[in-house]
Amino acid sequence: MLILSLLLSLSSPVHAAFPAPEKSTAPITIVFPAENSVLGPADAAWLIGNVSEPKGLFKINGETITVHPDGAWLAWVPVAPGTFTFSATLSVGTSFYAYQRVVDVLPPQAPLPAKPVAFDNDSLTPRADLELRPGDWLLTRAKVSPGAKPEFRLGRKGAWQPMREVVPALGIYEGAYLLRTEDETTGAPVQFRAQGHGGAAATAPGKVTVTRATPLVGVLRGQNVVMVRTGPGEGDLFPAIGGTRFVVGGRQGNELKLLLSNGQTGWIDGKTVEMLLPGAHPPRAETETVGVRSGERESTVRVGLGDRVPFIVEENEDLTAVTVRLHYTYLHTNWIVYPDNEDFVDEVRLKQETSDIVAMTVKLKPGKHLWGYWAGFEGNALKLELRKPPRLAKKGSPLSGVRVFLDPGHMPSAPGAIGPLGTKEMDINLAIAREAEALLKADGAVPILSRKDEKDEVSLVDRPKLAVEKKADVFVSVHNNFLPGSSNPFRGGPHGYSIFYYHPHSLELARAVYEGYHKRVPLSSEELRFGDYLVLRNPAMPAILTESAYLTYPEQEAMLLEEPFRKKLAAAIVDGLRAYFKDLRDQEKRR
């Protein structure tokens, strides 16, 4: 540790010294899992920690565990359901030390006993109250004793419906019923029954309302962006902006079902929506005059609508056009006005794509490509800002003058992953970002950090906002990785670096930085990846997220604690940025 401390003390003088982890002085330390943790159903679990004497004989539950020279260790230990104790021992000469860590291991899923016939009440769906309409499907699920042949019905007088076994080994069944007009009801239970050995009955916790009433109108509260999803708790469909109005045609618990145009549906957190009184006009927009305005950093397309309606923005494959699909909208545009000095937008086209969806496609001028965009409302008009690539220095470093937003992931209230020696991910991330900051400054770039020191608290939502406020050209979020709790750390590799992107206009930046890692970082590649991370969803600029190494592994934690390795990671990021902007500059020269 003395050598390591000396290395850390020699860090760059332009920054505060890297905060080395405070290694425990106890003979045995278990960093993860924490005392009384609940571990998922498994036959083994991994642990990390450290010992005070690396050359001692270290065991957990009688199995010898390999210890890294700095005292860190990683173990994969068999477990059993229920309260489980990890008993760790360390033998050093004539000295003997012992330490215990108690956890709760959930039992594996198993079928119910055949007798007496019973339902697993925790398996019954719907779990939450539902509001449905005729033509919707009522979907049910139940776990029941083997061979019981369960059925379900809506209400106490509904017809019994069959269920189909989908997981025979566990006795899990699913059922579906297409609701009809005559099923109209309020707060009806979903009941289950099963045959054999005395039979069994049960009722799902969620009640069902089936209504033919006119759908209500909801408006998104505030000015924040809220994600509309494909289903309750499912993937992203599109972001919606405060003031947007929707037709609401159902509910599942706290989630509202949105009836969009052309038969499409979406789901949104009900707490974010204000429901209007019955009789409120449904959302309806008509496209008015379209105006194009040229700016230094972006060109803006503005179209009057008369209402705030949902819209979905889509970039084309080669980033030469953007299409906005406006729901609940009807084409009524007579004029499209282009300024004399417009050098980015070539043409705007509108068409009635379906009966109530207008597609507005903005084509860029030949040789131009999209850098990023931002779409929002100005009153009841849609304002689409199309960002231009930054102007690059014609000579010297291609990074000269480029504004790079470096986002060291996590913060004191959410420190992220932790290593066997107690290394906090937030500290490593900041140290790498500081090294990248120094390299970028030396290359003439303008680095901007979301967190400048170890005490800074910057929320996840505020980080991309801050990048826009600071007029950044690119966004780089710096992270390190941690294994899922159920993974065997000694199988399923490789375990190394990975680079993530979200929007198509971020892909080339991700590729360039990935290549920088491939050339400089002596770890395995986990390849280039799409990642649905909040900080990457902001479409205003190319944005990527780096996962440099795994704090879980003692070898990789030790590497991250060494300044030369952190410099390599920073250099990989900057190499990628430099190559990306050099390619951009070369493309501009060829035009």
Enumerate the predicted regions with their spans.
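Short linear recognition/processing motifs and adjacent strand/loop elements at protein termini
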Residues: 17-24, 66-405, 412, 438, ...
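Soluble non-cytosolic domains of exported or imported proteins
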Residues: 234, 240, 423-431, 454-461, ...
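A short beta-strand segment in extracellular, disulfide-stabilized domains
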Residues: 44-50, 139-141
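Active-site-adjacent substrate-binding region
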Residues: 504-529, 539
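Bacterial N-terminal signal peptides
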Residues: 1-11
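Solvent-exposed loop/turn segments at secondary-structure junctions
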Residues: 410-413, 453-457, 480-485, 504-507, ...
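Active-site-adjacent mobile loop/cap segments within catalytic or ligand-binding domains
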Residues: 474, 484-485, 498-500, 527-591
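Active-site histidine-acidic residue metal-binding/catalytic motifs
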Residues: 385-466, 470-474, 484-487, 493-495, ...
